[in-house]
From Swiss-Prot:
Protein function: Essential component of the cytosolic iron-sulfur (Fe/S) protein assembly machinery. Required for the maturation of extramitochondrial Fe/S proteins.
HAMAP family, A to Z: ciao1
GO cellular component labels: cytosolic [4Fe-4S] assembly targeting complex; metallochaperone complex
Stored PROSITE patterns: WD_REPEATS_1, WD_REPEATS_2, WD_REPEATS_REGION
Annotated gene: Ciao1
Protein name listed in UniProt: Probable cytosolic iron-sulfur protein assembly protein Ciao1
Length: 335
C-alpha cells in the first residue's frame, strides 16, 4: 500500500479556497477562492510562496482557474457570471479579456489541447465554446444547452477537440464539432450516477474517463469507437462511452473532484468528508472490466471539505489540494 506524505501547507487566501491549477511546467501553480483573488505561487529552493495576487478581475467568488497549454494564459471562472483571461505580456499579469454571456455563476473553464478553444459552463445550464480569434480576442463558437440543470465541470479530451461536461442532472455529456456543417453537437450522454456529477477527468490518451459524484462513487467510462473489437454497437457511427467500473464504499460523503494522473495512472479524489484518496488500477485488470483499488487514504487531509485535487503534470506523484479550511497542501505519493 502507498502513503500520502504532506510536503507543504500554504496559506494566504481569506475564506474557502475553491480551485488550484498547476502550470504546464509544474513549478508554478495558481489558486482561487472566496476572496475574489487569484494567487500565483512559485517554488524557490524548497519554498513555495505567492509571487502575484490578481484581485481586480472579478466581483464575486472565483470558482476555477486553468492555464492554457502554452502556459502564457490563465483563465478564471467566477460567480459574477464572467470568465477572465489573464496573461503576462509586460512582465506583470493583467486581465486582457472578460468573456460575458452566461446568465449565472460560471462554474468551470477548460482549454483545448491546442489552446485554440476555451469551454465554460454555468449554473444557467449551458456550456459555451469560445474560439481564440487572435490577440486577446475570443469569439463564441457555440452555446450548448442539452443539460437540464446546473453544469458543474467542463474538461477537454487530451488529444482531440472533444469536450466533456458534468452536471447536477446526474449526467456527463460529450460534444464534438460536426465536420460537415461545423456545428457543435452533443454526441453522447453518459448515465449511471444517481446524483450530481461533480468532477471528470480523462486518462492520458483519452480513451477512458473517470467521474466522481454526490452519490459517493467514482466511475470509469471507456470509449468504444465504430468497428471496436468488443462488439459494442455504435449507432450513427458515433463513439459510445460505457461505464465499465464503479468504485464504491470508500467515501462517506460527496466527492467534489477527481484527477487522473497522466504520468502514473493514479486517480486522486477530493471529498466532502475532508479526505483525499488514491486509487490504482489492479495488475489483473481487464480492458472491458477494469478494477481499481485504493492504495492510500488521508482521512483528515484537511479540516473541512476538500474542493480540488490536481496531479502535477511534470513531477510524478506530486498532488496539490485545497479546501474550505483556507489551506493549500502539496503531497507526495509513495507507492
Amino acid at each position: 500500500m502507498g502513503r500520502l506524505i504532506l510536503e507543504h501547507t500554504l496559506q494566504g487566501h481569506k475564506g474557502r479556497i475553491w480551485g488550484v491549477a498547476w502550470h504546464p511546467k509544474g513549478n508554478v501553480f495558481a489558486s482561487c477562492g472566496e476572496d475574489k483573488a487569484i494567487r500565483i505561487w512559485s517554488l524557490t529552493g524548497n519554498t513555495w510562496s505567492t509571487k502575484t495576487i490578481l484581485s481586480d478581475g472579478h466581483k464575486r467568488t472565483i470558482r476555477e482557474i486553468r492555464w492554457s497549454p502554452c502556459g502564457q494564459y490563465l483563465a478564471s471562472a467566477s460567480f459574477d457570471a464572467t470568465t477572465a483571461i489573464w496573461s503576462k505580456s509586460s512582465g506583470e499579469f493583467e486581465c486582457n479579456a472578460t468573456l460575458e454571456g452566461h446568465e449565472n455563476e460560471v462554474k468551470s473553464v477548460s482549454w483545448s489541447r491546442s489552446g485554440g478553444l476555451l469551454a465554460t459552463c454555468s449554473r444557467d445550464k449551458s456550456v459555451w465554446i469560445w474560439e481564440v480569434a487572435g490577440d486577446d480576442e475570443f469569439e463564441c463558437a457555440a452555446v450548448l444547452n442539452p443539460h437540464t440543470q446546473d453544469v458543474k465541470r467542463v474538461v477537454w479530451h487530451p488529444t482531440k477537440d472533444v469536450l466533456a461536461s458534468a452536471s447536477y442532472d446526474n449526467t456527463i455529456k460529450m460534444f464534438a464539432e460536426e465536420p460537415i456543417d461545423n456545428d457543435w453537437d452533443c454526441t453522447a450522454t453518459l448515465t449511471s450516477h444517481t446524483s450530481t456529477v461533480w468532477g471528470i477527468d480523462f486518462d492520458a490518451d483519452g480513451e477512458r474517463l473517470v467521474s466522481c459524484s454526490d452519490d459517493t462513487t467514482i466511475k470509469i467510462w471507456k470509449a468504444y469507437h465504430p468497428g471496436n473489437t468488443a462488439g459494442v454497437a455504435t449507432p450513427e457511427q458515433q463513439t459510445v462511452w460505457k461505464c465499465v467500473c464503479t468504485v464504491s464504499g470508500q467515501h462517506s460523503r460527496a466527492i467534489y473532484d477527481v484527477s487522473w494522473c497522466k504520468l502514473t495512472g493514479l486517480i486522486a479524489t477530493a471529498c466532502g468528508d475532508d479526505g483525499i484518496r488514491i486509487f490504482k488500477e489492479t495488475s489483473d485488470s481487464k480492458p472491458d472490466e477494469p478494477t481499481f483499488e485504493q492504495i492510500t487514504a488521508e482521512e483528515g487531509a484537511h479540516d473541512q471539505d476538500v474542493n480540488s485535487v490536481q496531479w502535477n503534470p511534470v513531477v510524478a506523484g506530486q498532488l496539490i489540494s485545497c479546501s474550505d479550511d483556507g489551506t493549500i497542501k502539496i503531497w507526495k505519493v509513495s507507492e
